[in-house]
Each structure stands twice: as C-alpha cells, then as structure tokens.
Amino acid sequence: ALFMTSAQAEAGTGCPLSMTYSAVPALRTQPELAAEWEPLLVAPAYDGRLAVRDEKSSALCGMAMTEKQGGSDVRANTTVARPLEGAGGPGAEYELTGHKWFCSAPMCDLFLVLAQAPQGLSCFALARILPDGSRNAFHLQRLKDKLGNRSNASSEVELHGALARMVGEPGRGVTTIIEMVAHTRLDCVLGAAAGMRLGVAQAVHHAGHRSAFGARLVDQPLMGNVLADLCLESEAATVLAMRLARAFDEAAAGDERAARFRRLATPVAKYWTCKRAPAHAAEALECLGGNGYVEASGMPRLYREAPLNSIWEGSGSVQALDALRALARDPGGLDVLLDEVGEAAGVEPRLDAFVRGLRAELGDPDTIEARARRVVERLGLALQASLLVRHSPPAVADAFCASRLDGDGGLAFGTLPAGVDAGAIVERHRPGNDAGYSREATSSGGGELDVDAGA
C-alpha cells in the first residue's frame, strides 16, 4: 500500500526502490555478499554520494540483464565473465566485458548483472566504486530518450573488464536472479494499480467540481457510467495486487501453497493489470477534456507512464508464456489458483459459469500457446471477480461480473449495462472519502477488504 501511495506521487522513484528491495532475496543466495550489502539496501535513509561501500549510510541496487541482441532472451547474452583466479565460483571475483542495452537507475551503488562464465550464464554483483575508492570499469554510453518515466534515468552501459563477484552457482544465473525479477514484477502490478488509482482520483475530482449544461459532470448519467467503469477497473487492479503481495509475504514465511499460487498468479497479474493501464489512463485523461491534454494537469505524464509496467520485467507475451511454463511445470499450481477463485463459488452465478468455461479452455493443450494471452486474461478476470465478490460491496461485484464476465458491457470504458449503481461506485472512490474501500462505504453488507486500498 505504501509503494502504491508513493507511485501515485512520483512514479520515477519506483524503479530504484523496487530493484533495491527486490535484490535482497537474490543476494541472500551468497550469504557473505548479503552480509555486506543488505544492511545498506534496507536502510530507510537515502545517501546519494558516489562513494565506497564502507562510507555509505545506505545504498541502491539495480540490475543489468538486457542486451541489444537478446532482449527478454537473456540466455542469448554475450557479456563475458572471466575468473581472476583459478576456476572461480560462488563469491569469487571475475572480470566482465560486454554491454547492457537497458540499465535503469544507473546511479545505483550495486548492480546484479548476467554474464557468460565458462560454465554458462551466471549472476554477478558489480559495485560502482571499488574497495580502494576507484571507479569500476562501468561506462555509461548515453541516457535513453524515453516516451515516459523520464525522471528515472535509463542508460546504455559498456563493461570493460569491470570487477564483479559471482552470486549463486555458476551457470545458474537466471535461477539466481529470478527471485529479484519476481519481486519487481509484483511492483509492476502495484505500479499499474497505482496509476489507475491516480487516474480515477483526478477524473472523479474533476467531474465533481465541473459543471456543464446545467449540472455537475459527476451527476450526468453517461459521465457517471464512464467514471464507474474506471473505478471498477481500479478497484479490481488494487485487490489483485494486494492479494498477490500477501502471497509473496506468505511464501517468504515458508507457506508452500502460497508459493505455488504466487508462481502462477504473478505473470497472470502482471499481464492483465499492466495491459489495462494504458487504456485506463487515456479514458481518465479524456474525462478532463482539453484540460487533461495540457501538461499542467498531470494527465499527459500519467498517460506516458502507463505503458511502461507492461514492458518492464517482461512484456505481455513473455508473461503469458511464463504462465504457461508455470502450468506445465506445476499443474497443481492451477488447482491452487482456482481454489482461490473457488472461495467465491456459489455466491455469483456469472462467476461460476465463467470458471466452467475457463476450465474447458485450459483442457485444450494443442492450441494453448496461440491462445496464451486469452487464457491468462481470463485467469486474471476470474481472480479479480472472486476477490471483488468476497471483499467489495455488491454494487461493485455485480457491475464487474456483468461487464467483464457476462459480456454485458462494451469494449470501451463507459459501457456498463443498465441497472448498475454508478453513483455508489463513484462515491466509493471519491478523493477524501474516508471510508476507503470498506464494504460499508456503499453497502450494509459485512466484512472489509484485508487492506485499506483506498490509500
């Protein structure tokens, strides 16, 4: 929740924050490195000095995986790692030579880097400043001129014999760094949900204070439909992001079932939530009319930020195929995820029918790769609907199931069916509504959402 709040205020800080905290699980595979760096990485202060580690009060950690010829196919990387002494191995020093096409937050003190060691692709920890105070052979070539997220620098880097230490086992670099990637994917989901919440806050606030044709915009039926639809998408994204975050915490505490849920739910949530963000931002901007197209409103920046989380840490197709890999490696993981969905079984007939159709689609393995996006989309919708049925007011769950599961809605935002209580849904999301996301905000039903996602 705190990450989402921060991301609404300034999205550019999300990347270095996410990478820094996500690096901790990967570093723990090499205990001596974790002992050196973890206290600095989790320190709450910011020390922006380019200084040797022992002089720092805190540190940031980035990662450098992507190369121009490989992109998401990191096994095609050509950066070479040569051991300085003997055969090398975990914790040993290496010289790294090569390039990295995308390296965000290049001011970081430490980077996790993938490079080809003699035994295969391996993970390395590369410090910007060496223990003797000299700069490592980590050379910035230029900063990327990006569509959005411009307050977070992204660079191209060349390594000319840069010194680094191996993290984890040789030849198992992807396995070592994948835990970091999983955590940054969670933050992509949180970031996308945060962007939707910001868009809703701006649109609802504007519509509540702007009058046209004799009435406030928020009181006009068609605008109410648009706003309610945006609110539904935002709330669905938030509850899914929070449920996934809970699974990460439970898995870290040793809950095997939570770990299996997390493995499949992460690419599902990353794909679906992040895919919805750009269209959501565009519609929220349009709610402000011409004023939304002006930089001073903040909406153009939100619009430019919106596609990024879908690209970072593996684009849409990468996530869909990763979900298929998770299904193939652990078929029981699907049962765990559907058990979560099934906690709402018998409450909402449209959800029950949707799940039956989903099971039928999953039963056709011959064409599933071509249908991967569709399957993952439907898994995401099923999870969102189940969470809303269990934790949100009936007005929200009913509108979501009608428009997303039952086909009683159009392809654009603002096409909710007749009978939806748009006013109640919008009021629930109005900035300054202290009731937040509690069920009591719009309903007399019992229970509250696990997390005050209204933040």
Locations of the language-model features?
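C-terminal helix-coil-helix/basic helical segment that borders enzyme active sites and/or dimer interfaces
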Residues: 235-270, 286, 359-372, 376, ...
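Internal helix-loop-helix
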Residues: 1-52, 104-105, 305, 312, ...
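Flexible, small-/acidic-enriched active-site or ligand-binding loops
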Residues: 134-160
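C-terminal amphipathic alpha-helical interaction region
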Residues: 340-441, 454
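A short core secondary-structure module
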Residues: 91-137
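Extended amphipathic alpha-helical segments with heptad-repeat/coiled-coil character used for oligomerization
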Residues: 260, 271, 275-307, 313
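A glycine-rich, basic-preceded beta-loop-alpha segment at the flavin cofactor/substrate interface
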Residues: 132, 156-184, 201-218, 331, ...
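C-terminal catalytic subdomain
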Residues: 302, 306-345, 376-384, 392
